[in-house]
């Protein structure tokens, strides 16, 4: 045990020996720091206000100068100074069982949670303060906080011990406040437009709705494998079949894939479906929604992200994948007319690497786009008309069955949204799922399985529908100017630190 921890344990014991709790049951707070700072901004230096308050927070700074002490405490909204005089604190010790000025000098450490009662004053130096009359220990901290001058510089420690990051880094706290407000805003925005939020299963017997590798678990009682959902799409479409014309779900998605500054295996998305709409309607909805979120969260449609200024007020570019690939690479995929070898030769000339799985012109086009174009799309750009091979759930164009009515929105070089006119033809959908299943049987773990119940739902009849998915984490990265997705997820997935005791790994059918 460290000397600091031992000393703090002794202080906690000292409180108990004096008849006080070192870990209180409760404390009634009358106001927050932000309320008090705003309400009493008018006070002149040295002026006092006989306004009684009770306030609680974590001690972030402590200065004792003889018979006077200054503390800074932090609550969820901000920080405020405490002003303590020995004469005032000790005034009622004989009448009431209270902690003394000497107690607060000796027992309270930076990191402790305390509650105080007092009135308002502004010091001669202009610092709004609580003039403390009595105080209580709410929770004794046994470990010191990171040094306030150097902060928490170990980035991985910030992610592993987010509680420390939130204590010493106000920016991190603001990021998660902004995240919560944006999520609330999205729900209200959709609710006000008569969309209904639906809760779909997280545990599913078939993992569908996206090309992604799922997490697999096992249900002991039913003795069946289950999958954590990789999308909410197929169940939300079932709701549309059932007669709900405007539905959405904002929730967690799980994909057993890589980790990077843009990817976390557990992430948040909102999927939106509207009957009688198509992908053009979804483009309009996407642009309107994101502009409204930015205006609410940032107060402007011009933001700075990682030293790049982005103006969202300008019209957002809408361009086909073939045309934007031609713009940035010079390769005209319109000209190949089904000649895969010619396309393959042209692509190799610009140093695009691809696997044997890339065996059609459509997949080759997508590979060129991802490797040579995507990172260059800084301003909001709707890339439309995707190859049918990579879009098994999207409606084909009437005049060209090789491309589908799909778009993805790219901002600062990364995908932020994905949408399409939904495929509602059950015969076409079955053929595509059968093709996906054959790819899966050959080892492509990201290909779709055949979902017979979903196909049955389509055979019952689904109206024309537009569908949209927006990545919430990437949106929050943009709004908060965060470089990594780990900065906007409170508890991102990390590899466990090496422990001296190895954990026992249970077989799947024994996990409960």
From Swiss-Prot:
Its main location: cytoplasm. One of its GO terms (cellular component) is cytosol. Keywords: Aminoacyl-tRNA synthetase, ATP-binding, Cytoplasm, Ligase, Magnesium, Metal-binding, Nucleotide-binding, Protein biosynthesis. It catalyses: tRNA(Lys) + L-lysine + ATP = L-lysyl-tRNA(Lys) + AMP + diphosphate. Disulfide bonds: none annotated. One of its GO terms (biological process) is lysyl-tRNA aminoacylation. GO terms for molecular function: ATP binding; lysine-tRNA ligase activity; magnesium ion binding; tRNA binding. Mg(2+) 2 binds at residue 415. Mg(2+) 1 binds at residues 408, 415. Its cofactor is Mg(2+). InterPro entries: Aa-tRNA-synt_II, aa-tRNA-synth_II, aa-tRNA-synth_II/BPL/LPL, Lys-tRNA-ligase_II, Lys-tRNA-ligase_II_bac/euk, Lys-tRNA-ligase_II_N, Lys-tRNA-synth_II_C, NA-bd_OB-fold. It is found in: Cytoplasm. CDD domains: LysRS_core, LysRS_N. Homodimer. Belongs to the class-II aminoacyl-tRNA synthetase family. This is Lysine--tRNA ligase. It comes from Prochlorococcus marinus (strain MIT 9301). The lineage of its organism: Bacteria, Bacillati, Cyanobacteriota, Cyanophyceae, Synechococcales.
């Amino acid at each position: 045990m460290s000397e600091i921890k031992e000393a703090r344990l002794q202080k906690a014991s000292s409180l108990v020996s004096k008849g006080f709790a070192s870990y209180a049951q409760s404390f009634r707070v009358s106001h927050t720091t932000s309320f008090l700072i705003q309400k009493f901004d008018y006070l002149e230096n040295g002026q006092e206000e006989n306004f009684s308050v009770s306030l609680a927070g974590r001690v972030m700074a402590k200065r004792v100068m003889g018979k006077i002490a200054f503390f800074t405490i932090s609550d969820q909204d901000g920080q405020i100074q405490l002003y303590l005089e020995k004469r005032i604190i000790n005034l009622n010790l004989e009448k009431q069982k209270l902690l003394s000025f000497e107690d607060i000098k000796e027992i309270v450490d930076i990191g402790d949670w305390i509650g105080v009662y007092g009135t308002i004053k502004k010091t001669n130096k202009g610092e709004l303060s609580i003039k403390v009359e009595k105080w209580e220990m709410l929770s004794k901290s046994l470990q010191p906080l990171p040094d306030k001058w150097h902060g928490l510089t170990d980035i991985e420690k910030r992610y592993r011990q987010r509680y420390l990051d939130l204590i010493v880094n106000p920016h991190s706290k603001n990021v998660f406040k902004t995240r919560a407000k944006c999520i609330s805003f999205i729900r209200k925005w959709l609710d006000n437009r008569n969309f209904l939020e639906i809760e779909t299963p997280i545990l599913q017997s078939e993992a569908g709705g996206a090309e992604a590798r799922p997490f697999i678990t096992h249900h002991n009682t039913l003795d069946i494998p289950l999958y954590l959902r990789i999308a909410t799409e197929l169940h939300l479409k079932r709701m549309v079949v059932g007669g709900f014309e405007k539905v959405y779900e904002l929730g967690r998605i799980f994909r057993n894939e890589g980790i990077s500054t843009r990817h976390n295996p557990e992430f948040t998305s909102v999927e939106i479906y509207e009957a009688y709409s198509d992908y053009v309607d979804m483009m309009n909805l996407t642009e309107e929604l994101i502009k409204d979120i930015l205006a609410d969260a940032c107060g402007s449609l011009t933001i700075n992200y990682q030293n790049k200024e982005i103006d969202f007020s300008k019209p957002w570019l809408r361009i086909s994948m073939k045309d934007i690939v031609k713009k940035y690479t010079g390769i005209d995929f319109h000209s190949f007319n089904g000649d895969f070898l010619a396309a393959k030769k042209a692509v190799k000339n610009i140093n695009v690497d691809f696997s044997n799985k890339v065996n059609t012109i459509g997949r080759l086009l997508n590979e060129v786009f991802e490797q040579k174009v995507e990172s260059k799309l800084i301003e909001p750009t709707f890339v439309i008309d995707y190859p049918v091979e990579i879009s098994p759930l999207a409606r084909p164009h009437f005049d060209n069955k090789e491309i589908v009515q799909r778009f993805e929105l790219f901002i600062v070089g990364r995908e932020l949204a994905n949408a399409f006119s939904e495929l509602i033809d059950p015969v076409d959908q079955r053929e595509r799922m059968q093709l996906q299943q054959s790819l899966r049987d050959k080892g492509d773990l990201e290909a779709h399985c055949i979902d017979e119940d979903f196909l049955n739902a389509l055979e019952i009849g689904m109206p024309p529908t537009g569908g949209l998915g927006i990545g919430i984490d990437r949106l929050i990265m943009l709004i908060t100017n965060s470089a990594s997705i780990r900065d906007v997820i409170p508890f991102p997935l990390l590899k466990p630190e090496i422990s001296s005791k190895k954990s026992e790994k249970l077989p799947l059918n024994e996990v409960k």
